Amino acid sequence: MLKRTIILAAFVGCLAAAVQAPERKVVNNNIIISDHDPKVRIELPKSVWHVGVDRFILQDIADCELYAFVEVDDQKNVQRLYWIQFEDYLPSKPDLHHHYESPRHMTIGGFRFYVDTWVKRTNENITAGSDEDHIVALILSRGYKMPAGMISVRLVHLLDEQKRKELMIIYSENLTGFAPADLKKGGKAENLWLSLEDDLLVRARQEIKIEATSKP
């Protein structure tokens, strides 16, 4: 009985490790090639550093595979962040589906994305165990330093009709010269937000190249 218990425990341990092991996506400096969900090639600027990959179960509901890339200054202060995430609800959560209400969309390389933007303090309202918590921890663990505030655009592509799988790309920039509160409603630079947002979207489209390796 003890032997059977040990074997079962070892099997469960191996199974858990297999679930958590990074997928076989290829990272070559500034390029990610995924062979499934979706089949895609994502190319970032050659100036980026690949921080690393984190595979984890998000809030007990989704399997997430997170890739982080940064552009930094000489003191390793993050100036730009490229956050690429492949996410799939767990089979044990069949009733869950992604819902995005953004009216804005962008098509890159044949992939249609929902588009959202925001500005925030880097350490503002980070939920323990969230994907944001994971990426900040990964970046800091490599000796990089996060800026006080960032301006960000999130691109989300839903892979399937059931809306259970997604490719998410977040592009963020150091908010130089402003505090996040300055650009929010009622802030002293609120009138500049739309212009800064438009410029951010242009740069995101220019800096992130996406190509389907088969029909998306």
Where in the sequence are the language-model features?
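Conserved polar/disulfide-associated segments of primarily extracytoplasmic proteins
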Residues: F56-K185
